[in-house]
Amino acid sequence: MDQEVMDFFDFSKELKRVAAAPQGYISSDPRLMATKFKSSEVPNRELIGTDYVSKIVAKEKCLLNGTLLNEQPQGKRIRTLDDLDTDDEGEETEIRRDDEYYKKFRFNLNRDKNLSIYAKREEILAAINAHPVVIIKGETGCGKTTQVPQYILDEAYKSGKYCNIVVTQPRRIAAISIANRVCQEREWQQNTVCSFQVGLHRPNSLEDTRLLYCTTGVLLNNLINNKTLTHYTHIVLDEVHERDQNMDFLLIVVRRLLATNSRHVKIILMSATIDAKELSDYFTTTNSIPPVITTNHRRKHSIEKFYRDQLGSIIWNEEDVGHQQVPEINKHGYRAAVKIIVIIDNMERKAAIQSRQSYDEALRYGAVLIFLPGIYEIDTMAENLTCMLENDPNIKVSIVRCFSLMTPENQRDVFNPPPPGFRKIILTTNIAESSITVPDVSYVIDFCLAKVKVTDTASSFSSLRLTWASKANCRQRAGRVGRLRSGRVYRMVNKHFYQREMPEFGIPEMLRLPLQNSVLKAKVLNMGSPVEILALALSPPNLSDIHNTILLLKEVGALYLTVDGIYDPLDGDLTYWGTIMSRLPLDTRQSRLIILGYIFNMLEEAIIIAAGLSTPGLFAHEGGRSQLGDSFWMHYIFSDGSGSDLVAIWRVYLTYLNIVENGHDQESAIRWAKRFHVSLRSLKEIHLLVQELRVRCTHLGLIPFPVNPNQMMDDREKAIMLKVIIAGAFYPNYFTRSKESCADTDRNIYQTISGHDPCRTVYFTNFKPAYMGELYTRRIKELFQEVRIPPENMDVTFQEGSQKVFVTFKQDDWIEGSSKYVPVSGRVQSEVYKAVMMRQNRVERPIHIMNPSAFMSYVQQRGIGDVIEGRWIPPTKPLNVELLALPSVFDKTISGSITCIVNCGKFFFQPQSFEECIRNMSEIFNAPQQLRNYVTNASAIAKGMMVLAKRDSYFQRATVIRPENQSNRQPMFYVRFIDYGNCTLLPMQLMRLMPRELTEQYGDLPPRVFECRLAMVQPSSVVSGNNRWSTAANDMLKTVAQCGLIDIEVYSLFNNVAAVLIHMRDGIINDKLVELMLCRRSDEDYMSRKDHDFRLRRQESARNLSTAQRQQINEEYLRSCQLPQDHDLPPPPLEKCKTVVMLKGPNSPLECTMRSITRVGLSKRVNIDHLSVNALLLDADPQDHHDHLIVAHEIAESRNGQTLTARGTTLMPNVQGFGALMVMLFSPTMQLKCNKEGTSYVSVLGGLGCDPDTNEPYFAEHDVLINLDVNILEDDVILINQIRYYIDSVFFNFKEENNPAVSVNERVSIYTQLRSLINRLLCKDRRYIERNMSNADFEWETNPELPLPNEPFGKRAIFPMHSLTELQEEDTGRLVQLRENCSMLHKWRNFEGTLPHMTCKLCNQLLESVPQLRLHLLTILHRDREKQIDYCNQ
């Protein structure tokens, strides 16, 4: 343990040291949290409803009626009436004049009398003068939004009184467009008398503004900060019916302030579909009952409404009649909608005969709008309509989809007229209720359904629930017709059900969505506890939801665990993090991302990602169920192999910003967006939000640190740090990529694909051996054209006696069209991902083959292969294995030279034994008579041709890979030097055609080199990303290669690639790279370990074999190493292929699943959102047996609660123990649990902690548990405590102060320390340990003897210090047992019989066969465990 770590707590900083406090063990309210439960199950906490509301509301009513004005506030933390400024409500308010202002601007008092609201003008003004609150109910189009504020302003102008009106709108675009419309109508210059404010976008000065249109959130934040309404004379709350959380909380604030210090401000509530009685009761006092003024909007055209029971001509399913309680659309519902369209068409054909309007004109203005709840239902309806077209060719329809994730180009199709003779049918979600108006719609088919987002506050899981739409929604939908002519609405429910059963209004957001932002607003408002404030809502939430929200806010660091030092389950003091979160228009976890981004000096990246996560529809959806289009793969392109949807958002935005800043015109931007399948509209919204967040962060003091250029993070470090802050921001949305819990998982993978490389191979099934598959390889390759994989980039092979077809993709960067177009993380090639996606979209694919009975005559007539004893033998190329340059099975060490280095994972070695052969060939090739065949015409060079090409100063054998794709200069070709391994680009002048005699002599001679890779190591995710070897590691290998003759130790040979250890003077380069942290130790693949074991046993027996025996064994060995050949034969003509075989696949043995590590998600199935870059989840590092961590931005839950869907996912770096380290780093508190002997840590339990008296968790649902598979030591915990301390110190503020205590210079120093500590934590080489389930549970433990950690910030710590249980020394007797067990295993290693079942006690692994035992002894886990007990095999 180094001195720097031990000196951590001596960190000198002028901060107040507070006495240490117990963390996670503070008394709780037993009524809410004390329940008995099993460790693996989530406790069922009692649901506490709204009984708490009545007492609080009664007290508030007294306040509204003026009977509590003299009461003192309870407790210093609750601000109430006497803390607020007053407008002297007991005295007559002096009338403020504004004559000079009215002289500055022109006031035209002529209003539009054609609007229906005008008839109520005098009544509205009289009501406003007489009452503090007025409710106006007017249908859309009556003019209330633009006219009522003008009526008020005109009256003020007439009397010369001061007037300042604010009007809220739920959406930004509405506030801007309405303000501009009023300015245009009144001929006012914009941003003078009338203006707008959305977010932080506002005029430089509002001094001349008397009519302000703003979003609901803008007014709410102003009122919370000012705690008075008196800045305005009139507050108009428009679209009150929408009932989002901002509106409901605004009503709370307005009502409270109206009753206390702002009694002379007038409140006007307006909506089209308002529950007037509910609002009137909410604002009623003993002195005033708000009047309700209703105005009706007359339509020019009539609308007829029909219900299901009125559609007698449609045959409904008898079982459905009268049973509509379950909201759903079954197959009969879809068919009924199709029948209605047929009826509409027949009706218009008859009408055309009887009237002047032609049928074509009826089609043009007779569009049908079908309201469906989601994209799945849209696709299903489209399929039913397509079937209708096939059955009735007389009806021609143009199907148009409309939903929020579509591209703007596709959405424009909604407004375009259909082709002549076609009827437009628009399949839409509720987006067309109000956001989109299509004039030519004459018919609406409404299934009266909606998908509503609901969040479980205990689990934080959201779900889209299919529910009956409210009548208000249905009325909005009906209003889409009757614009140009009379219309019809078909509601697919019975009239009685519609009138009696369907809800009048939708569920308010406060009852179905997270309450974090509302609770934070209540804390900032500081007029009572969150419970006391939210109880006053129009629709108060359940007390359990408030309690869960408090716990969530404590989890994200927005609230301290305590209030004035005392634990309160329903409250907590506001942290500075919470203050920041309350001022950002984001979800709390997105705000946490920005906070951590600032701390780690990645603020800009965090802002962009947070803005992108807040804006839906960035990646355009093409519609339909197929994902094979380029739009899906754009996620991979922009994620750049990071495995992160969030990184993809960041890179898309940077690309867009580059287009904007470089001055490209709009058309260029549109072309770019269309090419890469991103939504330009969403990008513009993200851009606006990014700008707003930057301004807000600046106001909060969140400004990027001034860092010296030499201290800037490079791309590699930035990628790691970005993933660390993503893990911190979205804790505990953690998942692990799980593998089969089977000791023979590796063997099963290779057995499934017959020994092929799983990282490059997929397979089909259902192709019988009798089909003679070798003749159809080209036809099978053609299947991959749909994902644009060229045929030359794959080999198709078969296994004798099997129904499988194996497709192996070539691993060559020089092949045109190779996998680099779509970057992916890990070792798996992108072609494998594309192939698996093919199967996910369509399981079966047809292949046309000949009838087996006619096959033999076909191949015999054409001389294709041989037919021996009725069996067809495909033509094969003879292979002389004795000529191969591959290492012999008896060769352990080989001397030679490295001829070419691509990277540490691919280089070529030339044995010294070939030195004379190479020299002789070089002399022959470079003889003048052999170099006369100059290449004068590029057409003479063909792909795959063997030529003589110049390497350094001499010509050598080379194979042409392909021509360069450059037409503007002399022809050049990519060639590979056969006997050296390197590839290069050469002009024709440096190439010679090989004479025939040389081709005959050397054409079939295998390369005099073999490919190698470093054994038992892999690239470090911390040092280099995307499974790439770092430059430093490659440079070290090049330095060794330049030394000349070197010795390599062959570990294994698989797929003709040797895994080797390279010996140097001072050790082995493999170990040196690990020591220098340029790579990390890694297990070898199953096939590699199997080959290594085989080689070891053959080498041990070599002394007993003769030379001839050795040669025979080696030839058999090398022959067994060769995989089946791709015959690439031309298939029979299609006219001869009458039989269709349905291939099933492609499949990959690397497909895996995810599991949640939170307690609430442990038993649920987990999917990844189908649009995510991780939607195709493959085991990208199959040799690595660690569980890889995946972090989700959001988690959705299925309707039945059994399946979770992770959205916005990020695959974390493949670092040993990364998941456990992130839990220890970012959980509010954690416990390291020991094995039953107390000698090692075996699991990490993280969460909010527990009640010290009962050990019951505060927030059981969000407790996380990770079983350790690497060694976590005391040094690691001290490092993590350092990091937590530095994170806390950035925003630490004393209780009496509002701003953080540290200066900018101190923040730079903290950032520098954090970088260093994070790198040390992640780069550490940790030893593997066995998985131990003896103490892997969710039970919190208290240990009175455990010393409390030194707590620098006391109870004001967001990340308190972790305490640590001291480990015990391993018992001597136990060590002896483990060593004896190891010795026994090694003795059984060479046994040739049947192994009795035994267990490796070191690794807790059951061993059932000798081969399994041998391979287990070669794993890193076992070798590390042997070192830990000091075992040495003699």
Swiss-Prot record:
CDD domains attached to this UniProt entry: DEXHc_TDRD9, SF2_C_RHA
Pfam families: DEAD, Helicase_C, TUDOR
Cellular component, GO, one term: perinuclear region of cytoplasm
Listed PROSITE patterns: HELICASE_ATP_BIND_1, HELICASE_CTER, TUDOR
Motif (DEAH box): 238-241
EC number: 3.6.4.13
Domain Helicase ATP-binding: 125-292
InterPro entries: DEAD/DEAH_box_helicase_dom, Helicase-assoc_dom, Helicase_ATP-bd, Helicase_C-like, P-loop_NTPase, SNase_OB-fold_sf, Tudor, Znf_C2H2_type
Disruption phenotype: Egg chambers for females lacking spn-E display startmispositioned oocytes. At a low frequency, females generate early egg chambers in which the oocyte is positioned incorrectly within the cyst. At a high frequency, late-stage egg chambers exhibit a ventralized chorion. Flies show transposable elements derepression, an aberrant piRNA profile and a reduction of H3 'Lys-9' methylation and delocalization of HP1 and HP2.
GO molecular function, one term: ATP-dependent activity, acting on RNA
Domain Tudor: 938-1001
Residues annotated for ATP binding in this entry: 138-145
Keyword annotations from UniProtKB, A to Z: ATP-binding, Cytoplasm, Developmental protein, Differentiation, Helicase, Hydrolase, Meiosis, Nucleotide-binding, Oogenesis, RNA-mediated gene silencing, Spermatogenesis
Signal peptide residue numbers: none
Domain Helicase C-terminal stretches: 354-526
Catalytic activity: ATP + H2O = ADP + phosphate + H(+)
UniProt subcellular location: Cytoplasm; Cytoplasm, Perinuclear region; Cytoplasm, Cytoplasmic ribonucleoprotein granule
Domain of life: Eukaryota
GO biological process: dorsal appendage formation; germarium-derived oocyte fate determination; global gene silencing by mRNA cleavage; heterochromatin formation; intracellular mRNA localization; mitotic chromosome condensation; oocyte karyosome formation; oocyte localization involved in germarium-derived egg chamber formation
Family per record: Belongs to the DEAD box helicase family. DEAH subfamily.
PANTHER family assigned to the protein according to its UniProt record, in alphabetical order: ATP-DEPENDENT RNA HELICASE, ATP-DEPENDENT RNA HELICASE TDRD9
Cited function: Probable ATP-binding RNA helicase which plays a central role during spermatogenesis and oogenesis by repressing transposable elements and preventing their mobilization, which is essential for the germline integrity. Acts via the piRNA metabolic process, which mediates the repression of transposable elements during meiosis by forming complexes composed of piRNAs and Piwi and govern the methylation and subsequent repression of transposons. Involved in the repression of LTR retrotransposon copia.
Protein's name in the database: Probable ATP-dependent RNA helicase spindle-E
Organism classification: Eukaryota, Metazoa, Ecdysozoa, Arthropoda, Hexapoda
Gene that encodes the chain: spn-E
